[in-house]
Amino acid sequence: MFGTINTILTKIDDLVWGVPLIVMILATGIFLTIRLKGIQVRKLILAFKYMFSNETDGEHGEISSFGALCTALSATIGTGNIVGVATAIVAGGPGALFWMIVAATVGTATKYSECLLAIKYRTVADDGHIVGGPFYYIEKGMGENWKWLAKIFAVFGVLVGLLGIGTFSQINGITSAVNNFFDANNAWTVQLFGREYSWTVVIAGIILTIFVAFVIIGGLRRISAVAQVVVPFMAAAYIIAAVVILILNYKAIPGAVVEIIQSAFGMRAVAGGALGAMMLAMQKGIARGIFSNEAGIGSAPIAAAAVQTTEPVRQGLVSMLGTVIDTIIICTMTGLSIVITGSWDKGLEGVAVTTRAFQVGLPFPAKVSAFILMLCLVFFAFTTILGWDYYSERCLDYLTGNNQKVVRAYRWIYIACVFIGPYMTVSAVWTIADIVNGLMAIPNLIALLALNGVVVAETKKYFSKF
């Protein structure tokens, strides 16, 4: 039965992540990069300056620019950076990392554009909260006739929260890492749902479900507070560990880069399979890159809309750093660590691949390296679960007219999905996530292309002041 379900999911995944969507994602990023004259490079230093500034240029909003970036990073830096990169390289070869970086580079302009539009078209909800996101810039920017597209986006946003980035993949990644550390041989098992699971999976799942239930009741302000403390710490700890691996194995880096580039263009495949190998690397690299940095799927604009600013461009610059930090820095380090240690072709799956890279690459006993990775993954995934609860609730607010009874009921469903996640197979979890992520991106990319003139005009107007 599970085999049949996985086969069906894989076919749907191949359909969603076929050539049209890959071209659409890359083309949108390239088009916006050209229209904005490479703003992600030209204004990168200014973006970092704004990120570290505590100043706000207006009273509208609920959280600071740094708080919004941390909320967005808390939702983007998750299992995608550790497990997603590993699954992409295992499935698509080392070349998947190349396409992940390419998509992120042009996707930075996409992230800038969507967060700029979120500020420009945000509104005040009936309960007094500042709200915004793709559903509002589709409706207000493209016109009432496009409200159906906004609703489609919101529906897929809820599904991504429940079935994609928000719950299954994160909790599954956490419990897999915990199990890999405490009971790798599954010595202590229990029979559940017709299958055997380690007690570590069950216990970790229950504990994390309780923590999630506690935090999401606090709403955005508590999520933002948690994110601002946890995200910088967990990102720094993970980056330091990855840098140590790269420094200790620096002689292997040139060979790894060559292998990544050759794999990206199918150079190692036989002549007839070169194109297929290249397409597989593109598909897995871009899909898992989108999973990780969320550029183009429309999630970050929901957090950006709550920022205390009246300048859409300013927040667009800060928000685009999420893609730089998440993929161009963290995912690249993960991918290089996996390739230079050779852990990707050892027949391992999911978190075990990155764990193997840390065990081989770090100068510590295997248990210590596995523990470091487990801690990073727990923090990464936990904050992603919190961030996506907020995102999906805003989508639900839009669909239901801010019906709080529905939202409260949804929170229990969300918590239930967190509880279920540990008992799903790794392949099913990631395939489902890829499918709903791709479907969520389509209406947002359409809106970004339609409203590119607004983005360019706002950008020119802002920088004309300097």
Predicted feature locations:
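Flexible loop linkers connecting adjacent transmembrane helices
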Residues: 38-65, 87-89, 93-97, 109-145, ...
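Transmembrane helix-loop junctions in multi-pass membrane proteins
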Residues: 4-5, 36-40, 80-85, 161-174, ...
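Membrane-interface loop-to-helix entry segments
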Residues: 24-31, 36-48, 171-178, 199-249, ...
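N-terminal alpha-helical transmembrane segments of multi-pass membrane transport
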Residues: 1-79, 89-96, 107, 419, ...
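Membrane-interface alpha-helices at helix entry/exit sites of multi-pass transporters
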Residues: 57-62, 94-102, 140-152, 186-194, ...
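Alpha-helical membrane segments and immediately flanking helix-loop junctions
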Residues: 58-91, 117-141, 152-155, 159, ...
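Extracellular/periplasmic helix-exit of transmembrane alpha-helices
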Residues: 33, 114-122, 126, 241-259, ...
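Helix-loop-helix module between adjacent transmembrane segments
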Residues: 28, 32-33, 74, 103-128, ...
